[in-house]
Amino acid sequence: NESIRYFTDILDTKVFTHIFFSICRILNREKKGFSEDSISEELQKLVTKDYSSNISKATCNRAISWLYFSGIIGFCAKITEMDILDFKSASRCYFMDMGLANYYLTRTGTDSRVLAGTLNENYVYINLKKRQDFPPEISFETPAFATYRGGEIDFLAQSLSSSTRYLIEVKAGKGTASTAQKALAQGKADKLLYLKGATKGGIDGKTETLPIYLLEQYKFN
């Protein structure tokens, strides 16, 4: 096992599984980012609380760094109150592989409704991350979610070619997004993009609804 070379204790190597489960629980709960100051601190708090208090902060940090630089997890930024100058680069993390995400989310006992929503959101994260690789299509160094007036918007993206700002909401069912609608109405963005699993799609003014499986073909112009 390649990772074992970086860790000296059996507790160290088990931290990977603990981190995966903790990521799932964070993704499944309603939140505005981590309660701690960093991904490492939030995950360490969960890992030591739920699994073993013997796992050190240094071990947790090493494991998270290894997972990130190996392309197994990715970080998501937080934009507070739709202000792109208030940009916190690592406020959430996602899996970079949908099979891995499905496996661990299922093992945490996630019910089917929540599972579908979380997997859809993870899929959109991966798609946005690819659009920031060369040649980049959208702004920011990582995908980002946003907060606004006490609510949360799944993702915020901005076109590099036109500076058009998109609010992106990922819905597994027929839900609406009141926070995103409010931000759009108050001029905080140019468009609202709904990505849904069961829809034929359509355009209503500045709001566009798209079947999530067509996201790969969508262009942020």
Across the structure, where does each feature detected by a protein language model lie?
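Catalytic cores of nucleic-acid endonucleases
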Residues: 171-220
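Active-site beta-strand-loop-beta-strand hairpin of nuclease catalytic cores
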Residues: 157-167
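Short, glycine/charged-rich beta-strand-loop motifs at protein surfaces that mediate ligand recognition
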Residues: 113-114, 167-171
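Sequence-level motif detector for i,i+2 pairs with an aromatic at +2
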Residues: 90-91, 163, 190, 205
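Short, surface-exposed beta-strand-loop junctions and turns on beta-sheet-rich folds
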Residues: 110, 161-163, 174-175
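Accessory nucleic acid-recognition modules appended to NTPase machines
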Residues: 1-153, 157-159
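A structural signal for isolated positions on well-ordered beta-strands in alpha/beta enzyme cores
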Residues: 144, 166, 191-194
